[in-house]
């Protein structure tokens, strides 16, 4: 499983994620955050602010 530690990562909760994810200011996702911001896809995939490789989906369970 691909893991990326964002310096702005919040371990529990956050302004746009559920209890098993966390968000940075760019909408970065935790492992089971389901699509919470401009950098996230519907399966918890993340864009560049979460260490991903595309603007829509770079890391997450179904990317």
Swiss-Prot record:
Tissue specificity as recorded in UniProt: Testis.
Entry keyword set: Developmental protein, Differentiation, Repeat, Spermatogenesis
BP GO terms, sorted: sperm axoneme assembly; spermatogenesis
Cross-referenced Pfam families: MSSP (PF03940)
Superkingdom in the source lineage: Eukaryota
Domain comment quoted from the record: This protein is mostly composed of repetitive C-G-P motifs.
Family of this protein: Belongs to the MST(3)CGP family.
Name of protein: Male-specific sperm protein Mst84Da
Species, as recorded: Drosophila melanogaster (Fruit fly)
Gene: Mst84Da
């Amino acid at each position: 499983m691909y893991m990326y530690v964002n310096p702005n990562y919040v371990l529990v909760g956050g302004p746009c994620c559920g209890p098993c994810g966390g968000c940075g200011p760019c909408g970065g996702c935790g492992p089971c955050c389901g699509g919470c911001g401009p950098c996230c896809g519907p399966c918890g995939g993340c864009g560049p602010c979460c260490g991903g490789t595309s603007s829509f989906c770079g890391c997450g369970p179904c990317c």
